[in-house]
C-alpha cells in the first residue's frame, strides 16, 4: 500500500464518519440534513480517495455493496439460542401469561413489562466485535442459522460500526427483524408482475427472499429496513433491563421499534396493546401483533426458557381482519409493459373499518389455482391492515351459475392477440401502441422515482390522454398552460404550477431518465448500474447485449431488452426530441475506469490459520475481483494455505489444484 499523507488519511476518516452519520439521519431517523446531491458528491470523493490510496476503513459506506455472488450460504452458530415466542390470541391468554410469570417468580407484585409492535419480517442477529460488524446471520433453527453478512451490509440503516455510546462492548450480538415497508413490497411485486415473475405473497416473504439472495446486489436493489430489539451474547458491558438496552441501541444509532412502552402490570400492558392497534393503521410496515417482555434482565434469567421459547415474553396476535363478499367481476388490467393482470371487483365489504371493493389477483395462474369464478362468495383478508387479497372461495355457497374465468386471448383495450412466453406466468399484449400501455408509460415517466413531475398524478394523465392532449410522454414537454386551464381541477394557478413542475423536471440525472423511459426489465437498480458504466445517454445508442452483460449484475435477459430499446429508431427519435425541448441530463453516478482486478474470474478456497482474520482475507480477494468458495472442487483455481491446514489441502492435492502461501497470495495482489 502507498504511503498515505496524513491529511488524506484524515479526510477519508472524516468522510466515512460524516457519511455514516447522514445514513443514520436518512435511513433511521428519516430526517436528512443534507440534499441527495451533497451526499452523492461526498460519497464520490470518498470513492476517489479510496481507489487512489487504497486506504479503506471497514465501516466505510463503500463497503456495503460489492461482494461477489456466493454458491451457498455458510452455516453460522448462535452463541446464545435465538428462541421464538409463544403466542397469545386473546386478552385472557395475556392475563394467564402474567399470572404464570408471577407464580414462577413467587410474587404477587405487579411486574414491569415492555410492549412494542411485532414486526413481520426475517429474524436476524448482528454480531459486533470491538464495535465493528463482522457477522450477520439468520435465526435458522434457533441454534444454527446462515451467514448473510454481505447482504446485511447493504441495508443502510444498520451501523457497520457502533458509535455514539458511552461504552462499546468487546463483543455483542444484537437481534432484530429485517422487513420491507408496504410501498416497497408493492413496488417489488409490480416489478415482478411486469417481468412475468411470481409475486411474493406478503412483505415477510419478500423480506426473507430479499435477504437470502446469493447475489448481494439483488438485496441492495431493495429498500430493506431493520428494527433492533433483542440481545444475545454480550461481553464487556452489562444491561439491567430491556428499556436500558433499547436506549443504548438508540444512542448507538441502531433502528429500534417504532413504539416501546414501559408498562407496570398487565392492565397497562393491555392499554399499550390497544394503543398500538390504533397506531398500526398509520405504520408504513406490516404488524400483526405486539410483543410483551419482562423488563428486568435479572427476572428474565430467573424465569428462564422452555425448549423453544422464553418464559419471560409473549407475542399477542391481533384478530385477523377478514370478510366474505361476492365477486362481481374479474377485470383485465393492462400495465405499461403490456402485462395483463386480473383484478377482482367485489361487492363492497367492510374489513377492519375500511371498505374494500377491489383486490388484485396477481396473475391468471392464481385464479386457476384457487378456482375463483365470477359470482363466487370469496374470503377477503386485509393483510397487515393494508393490502386486501382473496384467500379462498366459499364453495358450499355456489349455485351453479358462477362463471369460470378464462385467460384473455386478446387485449381488453386494443384487441391485439395476447402472448404468453414458455415458463412465464405473465400474459402480455405486445402492441406497443396499445392505449392502455401508452397511458401507463406516461404515468411511469412522470412518477416520483422517475422524472418526478409534481402535481401530475394518475388521474391527470388519464384526463389528458383521454382528451387526446398527450399521446406520448414526449408530449408532456409540449404542454402549454392554455392546453390545461379550464380542464376539471385546473384553474389559473393550478395549471401554471403544473407547467412549472414539468419545466423543472427537464433537469434530471441519467439514472432517473433511464428508469423513466420504462425499458422492460430495467428498474431503479439496473438504471443506476447503467449510469455508473456509461457517461452519457448517447453512449447507449445502438448498444449490443454482448457489451452490456460485461457489467456485473446485468443478465442476458435484461441486456437483450436494453439492446432492443436502444436499437429502436422510434425510441431514439423520442429521446432526441426530449433533448430539443430542453432536457438537461447530469450523471453524478458515472465511475471512471477502475484499476484492474488482478484476481478477476479466479476462485479461491482458504484453509488453515492466516496472519489476518479469514473474513478480512475473503474481502481482499473479492475486492480484487476474485471469488471465495467454502469447498475444494475441480472449479477451484487456488487453495490459500495457512498454518495447520485441514483436509482441504489433501483434497486440493488429489485434484491437482494449485496451492498458495499467504506471501504468494499478497504478490498476486500487487
UniProtKB/Swiss-Prot annotation:
NAD(+) binds at residues 36-40, 84-85, 116, 139, 177, 293, 317. It holds the Pfam family BRCT. Zn(2+) binds at residues 411, 414, 429, 434. Its cofactor is Mg(2+); Mn(2+). InterPro entries: BRCT_dom (IPR001357), BRCT_dom_sf (IPR036420), DisA/LigA_HHH (IPR041663), DNA_ligase (IPR001679), DNA_ligase_CS (IPR033136), DNAligase_adenylation (IPR013839), DNAligase_N (IPR013840), Hlx-hairpin-Hlx_DNA-bd_motif (IPR003583). Its EC number is 6.5.1.2. Belongs to the NAD-dependent DNA ligase family. LigA subfamily. DNA ligase that catalyzes the formation of phosphodiester linkages between 5'-phosphoryl and 3'-hydroxyl groups in double-stranded DNA using NAD as a coenzyme and as the energy source for the reaction. It is essential for DNA replication and repair of damaged DNA. This is DNA ligase. The lineage of its organism: Bacteria, Pseudomonadati, Nitrospirota, Thermodesulfovibrionia, Thermodesulfovibrionales.
Amino acid at each position: 500500500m502507498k504511503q498515505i499523507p496524513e491529511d488524506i488519511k484524515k479526510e477519508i476518516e472524516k468522510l466515512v464518519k460524516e457519511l455514516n452519520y447522514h445514513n443514520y439521519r436518512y435511513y433511521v431517523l428519516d430526517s436528512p440534513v443534507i440534499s441527495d446531491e451533497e451526499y452523492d458528491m461526498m460519497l464520490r470523493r470518498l470513492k476517489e480517495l479510496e481507489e487512489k490510496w487504497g486506504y479503506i476503513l471497514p465501516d466505510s459506506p463503500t463497503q456495503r455493496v460489492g461482494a461477489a455472488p456466493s454458491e451457498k450460504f455458510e452455516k453460522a452458530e448462535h452463541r446464545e439460542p435465538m428462541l421464538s415466542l409463544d403466542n397469545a390470541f386473546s386478552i385472557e391468554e395475556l392475563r394467564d401469561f402474567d399470572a404464570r410469570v408471577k407464580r414462577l417468580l413467587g410474587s404477587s407484585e405487579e411486574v414491569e413489562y415492555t410492549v412494542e409492535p411485532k414486526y413481520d419480517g426475517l429474524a436476524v442477529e448482528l454480531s459486533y466485535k470491538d464495535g465493528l460488524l463482522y457477522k450477520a446471520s439468520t435465526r435458522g433453527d434457533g441454534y444454527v442459522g446462515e451467514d448473510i453478512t454481505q447482504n446485511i451490509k447493504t441495508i443502510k440503516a444498520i451501523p457497520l460500526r457502533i458509535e455514539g455510546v458511552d461504552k462499546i462492548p468487546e463483543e455483542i450480538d444484537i437481534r432484530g427483524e429485517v422487513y420491507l415497508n408496504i410501498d416497497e413490497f408493492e413496488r417489488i411485486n409490480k416489478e415482478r408482475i411486469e417481468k412475468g415473475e411470481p409475486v411474493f405473497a406478503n412483505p415477510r416473504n419478500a423480506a426473507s427472499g430479499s435477504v437470502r439472495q446469493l447475489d448481494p446486489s439483488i438485496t441492495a436493489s431493495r429498500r430493506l429496513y431493520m428494527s433492533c430489539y433483542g440481545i444475545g451474547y454480550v461481553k464487556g458491558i452489562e444491561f439491567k433491563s430491556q428499556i436500558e438496552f433499547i436506549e443504548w441501541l438508540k444512542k448507538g444509532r441502531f433502528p429500534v421499534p417504532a413504539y416501546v412502552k414501559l408498562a407496570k402490570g398487565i392492565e397497562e400492558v393491555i392499554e399499550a396493546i390497544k394503543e398500538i392497534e390504533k397506531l398500526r393503521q398509520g405504520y408504513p410496515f406490516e404488524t400483526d401483533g405486539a410483543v410483551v417482555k419482562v423488563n428486568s434482565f435479572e427476572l428474565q434469567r430467573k424465569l428462564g426458557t422452555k425448549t423453544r421459547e422464553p418464559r419471560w415474553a409473549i407475542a399477542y396476535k391481533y384478530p385477523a381482519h377478514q370478510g366474505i363478499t361476492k365477486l362481481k367481476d374479474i377485470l383485465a388490467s393492462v400495465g405499461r409493459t403490456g402485462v395483463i393482470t386480473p383484478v377482482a371487483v367485489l361487492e363492497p365489504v367492510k374489513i377492519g373499518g375500511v371498505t374494500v371493493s377491489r383486490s388484485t389477483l396477481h396473475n391468471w395462474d392464481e385464479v386457476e389455482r384457487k378456482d375463483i369464478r365470477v359470482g363466487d362468495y370469496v374470503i377477503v383478508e386485509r393483510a397487515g391492515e393494508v393490502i386486501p387479497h382473496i384467500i379462498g372461495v366459499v364453495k358450499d355457497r355456489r349455485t351453479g351459475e358462477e362463471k369460470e374465468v378464462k385467460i384473455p386471448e386478446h387485449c381488453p383495450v386494443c384487441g391485439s392477440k395476447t402472448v404468453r412466453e414458455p415458463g412465464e406466468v405473465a400474459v402480455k399484449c405486445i402492441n406497443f401502441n396499445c392505449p392502455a400501455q401508452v397511458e401507463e408509460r406516461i404515468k411511469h415517466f412522470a412518477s416520483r422515482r422517475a422524472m418526478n413531475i409534481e402535481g401530475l398524478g394518475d388521474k391527470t394523465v388519464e384526463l389528458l390522454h383521454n382528451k387526446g392532449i398527450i399521446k406520448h410522454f414526449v408530449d408532456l414537454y409540449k404542454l402549454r398552460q392554455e392546453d390545461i386551464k379550464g380542464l376539471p381541477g385546473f384553474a389559473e394557478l393550478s395549471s401554471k404550477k403544473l407547467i412549472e413542475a414539468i419545466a423543472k423536471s427537464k433537469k434530471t440525472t441519467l439514472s432517473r431518465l433511464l428508469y423513466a423511459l420504462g425499458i422492460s426489465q430495467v428498474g431503479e437498480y439496473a438504471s443506476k448500474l447503467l449510469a455508473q458504466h456509461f457517461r452519457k445517454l448517447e453512449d447507449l445508442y445502438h448498444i449490443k447485449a454482448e457489451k452490456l452483460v460485461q457489467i456485473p449484475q446485468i443478465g442476458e435477459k435484461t441486456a437483450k431488452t436494453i439492446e432492443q430499446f436502444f436499437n429502436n429508431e422510434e425510441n431514439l427519435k423520442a429521446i432526441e426530441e426530449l433533448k430539443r425541448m430542453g432536457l438537461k441530463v447530469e450523471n453524478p453516478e458515472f465511475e471512471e475506469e477502475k484499476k484492474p482486478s488482478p484476481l478477476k474470474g479466479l476462485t479461491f478456497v482458504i484453509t488453515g490459520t492466516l496472519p489476518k482474520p479469514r473474513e478480512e482475507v475473503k474481502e481482499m480477494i473479492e475486492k480484487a475481483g476474485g471469488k471465495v468458495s467454502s469447498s475444494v472442487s475441480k472449479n477451484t483455481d487456488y487453495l490459500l494455505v495457512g498454518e495447520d491446514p485441514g483436509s482441504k489441502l489433501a483434497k486440493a492435492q488429489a485434484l491437482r489444484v494449485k496451492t498458495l502461501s499467504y506471501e504468494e497470495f499478497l504478490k498476486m495482489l500487487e
